Amino acid sequence: PRSEVGIDIEQYGQRVHKVAHKYMRPDELISEYQGEDTWSLLLHWSAKEVMFKCMDASEVDFREHLRIMPFQVCEHGEFPAEEYRTEHKKKFMIRYLLHPDFVMTWQVTSAYSVNECDTP
């Protein structure tokens, strides 16, 4: 069996706010982490990069064809996502890690589960 693998790392920064309208769908929810929404925006962008890398498709519009399902941002976790560009309409389980300087997202299989934050 063939595994789909994608990974993306995005440096922390405010520039993501300026381009959010190009990749955020109206039905995607932004959640705050440590009192700001930058982390959520970065995770959405990075996750969509991962999805694109795992798709065998061209002309993918990140806003129209890729959707991140609602999740609560934690230091690390996973969340479901879907693509609407291909005939297969793949579902993804995006895993992520927050670091003070960057976010990292990856996907190895097409599993579908729920995000749960670790509680201290």
Which residue ranges define each predicted feature?
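Core catalytic alpha/beta fold that binds nucleotide/phospho-ligands
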Residues: 1-120
